[in-house]
Amino acid sequence: MGKRRRGKQEIDNLTKKQKKHLKEFGEQHPFHDKVVERPEKTQILRLPDSPQRPEPDSEDDSDAEQPSAYQKLLSTMIQGDEDDVESEDEESEEEDNEEEAEVEGDSEEEVEDTDEEDGNDAEEVLEDKVEETSDKLQKKHPEKTNGDVEENEEAEMEGEFTDKKNEAAFCLETNMPAEGEENTAQQEQDEDMFVKHQEIELSEEEVGRISQGSKVKTQVKWAKLGVLQCMCPLERFPAIGQASSAPLPPIHKTLEANWHLLNLPFGAATDVTELQKEMLGLMGTYRDLYLANLSPLKEAKEVRSAYCLHALNHVLKANSRVLRNNAKLKESKNGDEDFRDQGLTRPKVLILVPFRDGALRVVQTFMTLLEPKGKKTDASNKKRFKEEYGEETDEKPPNLQRPDDYHAVFSGNIDDHFRIGMSILRHSMRLYAPFYSSDIIIASPLGLRTVLGAEGEKKRDHDFLSSIELLIVDQADVFLMQNWEHLLHVLEHLNLQPLDSHGVDFSRVRMWNLNNWAAYYRQTLVFSAIQEPQITNILTKHCHNYRGQVCSKTIPKIGSICQVLVQLPHVFQMFHSDSFMDQDARFQFFVDKILPQYRDSVMSHTFIYVPSYFDFVRLRNYLKKEDVSFANISEYSQRSEVSRARHYFQKGEKQFLLFSERFHFYKRYTIKGIHNLIFYGLPTYPHFYSEVCNMLQAGVREGGASVSFTCTALYSRYDVHRLAAITGADRAAQMLQSKKTTHLFITGEEKST
């Protein structure tokens, strides 16, 4: 214990300057070195009156000193990035204090560890500190351990771990096909849509027609996918027919053994389902696809497995073609053969998922599909990946009572800031590959946004998205609940002309990539739990596939209003609006027609549900201005603010409670004390309507049975999808076509009328 206290005391006695130096360089400045009494090894030299003794605040003389072994070690890690070190020296006083606290805490732990093992002096404490500092530097700047990788490539993953060891093993330019793999070219027959799609040549006239957005629309009905709307921009690529006319695409030889085990990762039946067969048939045509109304409890897992197979099949075919052409070029004597089989950058597939758990499940599906017979998939950095993307056992409180769909969406690790690159070669997978060496990038919109940056920023990079051939947007509805602008920002940076060549061999680049036509060849797959105009707008504005688009148009016949259990009159009031984005009309209708009815003190306990946060802020400011008694709860409210608002509203001390939809999405609290319910806008998720209405049961259970409840919902003709999901397709059609602007439904003991 004495040695431990002595080591801790030495750290505590350091000045702030000394601690900062220890933090940055892993050892004390030579002036402050304390030599341990070891007469046989160390000579003690004291110079108390030396006129050349350096001042503690002076760093000029340190450069003249001969660098120690520790400094030489660190210099190899931070070589080429002196600017970053200098910028750290210019940090503010607050950051210095934070570093000081961090050094103290970390050093105390290191002292205890070294004393328990074999620490006899303060030098071992400093040695451990050097190793700790080196690890931190390597994690913060992994690119500095390999000077062969270009700076732009490293900037994308700054502050994150990237795999540098397996660069040569997964390099497409230097690898050759394995034995027996040369004959796999027979798979690439003219009937393979992958080959057709890659080799189609468009004319400038056809590109112009696609850009204009004119499309021929038709409808078909499939057994599982329901009603599908097909939009074709070019006549020579007609619309799809019935499900039987879209057979399963050819599967790459690497996947032949396991592709039928598509549903094995989530413990379902091993056979491919009918839904997956229809999806694979559609995706194999390389048309854009938008499927909505996919329940996270039922179809979500099947959908994930299907698009993982399609993405992996696409990457393996593309890489196999490159490897075969490498062998042909090597055998060619004159070298006159021309093989255009690549894009301007290597990444081919971009998969956007909202949470880390989604990325984990995608990678697990990839591993299952790539697994050779009798062996496990060779995946580098698998342990690190499971640690960073897996769920910690103590993250969620026990006995959390939430709906089943909530647990399905928020299962596992729900961190929404991540990005990871993957390289695929035969049965092997390289996790944490640098983006410019990756075949597949799995990320959240927020994770990519921090790399892409914004206009005018110094550190930004989007070249790795220049040659994306397959874009997959899974759980698009969840992105609406996060930040939709991040997703749009990513879409705006797809298939742009790169600013740097990144070492590409232009003789191998496809002509449509050189012509900046990659956007017309990119396939986009969008999957969502709801029908929403903002999601549909993705395909309208950001997708220009020359093969056209297929969108699901199935509307539920039975609405979520049938799931309301409490006896409640539902009044739907329609207001006139000129466009989907016209929020002024909704606000004026609410202020002029709805709110005055509830200003009377008799109409207390009024709950206002607001889907849009912008509308939430607008209403909050208006209620403050009008001096209305209200409380508010949003996704940005602190826990104490939420508790006070719920208490004041339940006790009647606040007449109104302003409630944002995103808070309900992330928390699913039951609000007690609701007597009057106002939907400022129809909920984004139809089951939210019934969930909020059933909150009135909480008041009934606590003795409020004698209270008469009311419910009012506002809608316009642009809310057709939300209205149909709540009231049902037939009733929604009648309401929109009727000359009346008010419609009444009764739920509870009586049937809805």
UniProtKB/Swiss-Prot annotation:
Gene3D superfamilies annotated for this entry? P-loop containing nucleotide triphosphate hydrolases
Function, as annotated, reads:
Component of the ribosomal small subunit processome for the biogenesis of ribosomes, functions in pre-ribosomal RNA (pre-rRNA) processing. Essential for embryonic development in part through the regulation of p53 pathway. Required for the expansion growth of intestine, liver and exocrine pancreas, but not endocrine pancreas. May not play a major role during the early stage of endodermal organogenesis. Also involved in the sympathetic neuronal development. Triggers the degradation of p53/TP53 and Delta113p53 isoform in a ubiquitination pathway independent way.
**Where do the segments described as Represses p53/TP53 degradation lie?**
628-689
Region annotation Promotes p53/TP53 degradation: where it falls in the sequence: 1-189, 566-627
Q: Which residues form a coiled coil?
A: none
The UniProt record lists the keyword Phosphoprotein:
yes
Q: How is it modified after translation?
A: Phosphorylated. Phosphorylation is required to facilitate the nucleolar localzsation of CAPN3 and promote p53/TP53 degradation in the nucleolus which promotes cell cycle progression and liver development.
The UniProt GO MF terms for this protein read: rRNA binding; U3 snoRNA binding
Where is it found, in Gene Ontology cellular component terms? nucleolus; nucleus; small-subunit processome
Tissue specificity remark: Mainly expressed in digestive organs at the later stage of organogenesis. Expressed in liver, gut and exocrine pancreas, but not in the islets.
| Key words, A-Z | Developmental protein, Nucleus, Phosphoprotein
Q: Which domain of life is it from?
A: Eukaryota
Residue ranges with Acidic residues bias: 80-126, 148-160
Record protein name field? U3 small nucleolar RNA-associated protein 25 homolog
